[in-house]
């Protein structure tokens, strides 16, 4: 909850979810303006919303998928952002409603069992959010992240004029090897290979093509699709990462599905990724992963 007022050492209360720190909102808007100045499009996304975040860590007071109060707070946030950007061209700023939605049994337990949000529930919330946004800024491009943490196409939204966002994290054995927010005991994560067999399952180019086929079919229906996040955490062996990611890009780019790394600089990034098996090049004092750069070109 980057821009709400709350006490970090206490659970978030329902009323705090709509107490907005306008000074922080100003900072976010200025950042978007700076990006636009350099001809970068900004896709504004709520990584944490009232009643849901893919990463637990703050005590949520309610469940976005079950509680009307949470949904009303969610609409409140998007109305605020719509008003903030109503005079900014949709070419410069789009809205991505919520990062990696899933239905988690316990919103406050990172390792709680989870699965897809029921389609009618996702449709209701996405449709009502879009109505709130379009009442203020009618031409705004709206994007919904794939169901089940970004992995699944959402057929329930295809008639709503809402585009969809997939992920480049399949299989998670590759992308999140030993990541502590995924593995309770990172030492038990199986060693990734590409292509090859992991935990008794075959993974390779054919499995990737099968995974992305529904997304490619969605493009064929005339809807926009982008891969809003992707990459590997720093513990994945670099040759495995490059071979796997090269296959993903070979599958997505012929179908005009753009993509983004989770971060530009950091553990998933092209700069300062902190890997132990990369011969970095110096780039203005930063450590550049040149082999990854070549793939991205």
Where are these regions (language model features)?
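Surface-exposed, active-site-proximal loop segments in enzymatic domains
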Residues: 2-25, 50-69, 105-114, 270-279
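Aromatic-rich peripheral "rim/lid" segments of glycoside hydrolase catalytic domains that contact
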Residues: 237-297
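An exposure/low-complexity boundary signal
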Residues: 8, 14-16, 221-236, 240-241
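Short, solvent-exposed turn/loop segments enriched in Gly/Ser/Thr/Pro and often Arg
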Residues: 1-2, 46-52, 98, 146-148, ...
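Conserved Rossmann-like nucleotide-binding pocket used by diverse enzymes
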Residues: 42, 226, 260
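Active-site region of glycoside hydrolase catalytic domains
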Residues: 56, 62-203, 209-232, 254-257
């Amino acid at each position: 909850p980057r821009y709400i007022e709350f006490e970090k050492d206490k659970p978030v209360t329902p009323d705090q979810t709509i107490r907005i720190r306008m000074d922080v909102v100003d900072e976010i808007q200025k950042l978007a303006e700076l990006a636009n100045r350099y001809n970068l499009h900004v896709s504004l996304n709520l990584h944490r919303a009232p009643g849901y975040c893919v990463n637990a860590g703050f005590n949520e007071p309610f469940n976005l998928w079950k509680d009307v109060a949470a949904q009303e707070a969610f609409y409140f946030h998007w109305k605020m952002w719509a008003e903030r950007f109503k005079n900014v061209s949709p070419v410069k700023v789009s809205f991505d409603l919520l990062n990696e939605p899933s239905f988690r049994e316990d919103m406050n337990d990172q390792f709680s069992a989870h699965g897809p949000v029921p389609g009618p529930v996702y449709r209701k919330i996405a449709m009502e959010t879009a109505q709130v946004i379009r009442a203020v800024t009618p031409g705004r491009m709206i994007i919904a992240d794939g169901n089940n943490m970004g992995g699944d196409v959402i057929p329930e939204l295809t008639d709503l004029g809402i585009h969809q966002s997939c992920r480049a994290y399949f299989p998670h054995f590759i992308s999140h090897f030993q990541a502590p927010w995924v593995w309770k005991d990172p030492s038990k994560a199986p060693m990734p290979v590409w292509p090859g067999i992991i935990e008794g399952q075959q993974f390779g180019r054919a499995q990737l093509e099968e995974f992305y086929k529904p997304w490619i079919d969605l493009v064929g229906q005339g809807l926009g699709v982008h891969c809003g996040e992707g990459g590997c955490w720093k513990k994945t062996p670099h040759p495995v990462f490059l071979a796997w990611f090269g296959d993903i890009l070979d599958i997505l780019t012929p179908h005009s599905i753009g993509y983004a790394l989770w971060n530009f600089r950091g553990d998933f990034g092209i700069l300062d990724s902190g890997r132990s098996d990369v011969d970095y090049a110096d780039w203005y004092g930063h450590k550049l992963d040149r082999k990854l750069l070549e793939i991205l070109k």
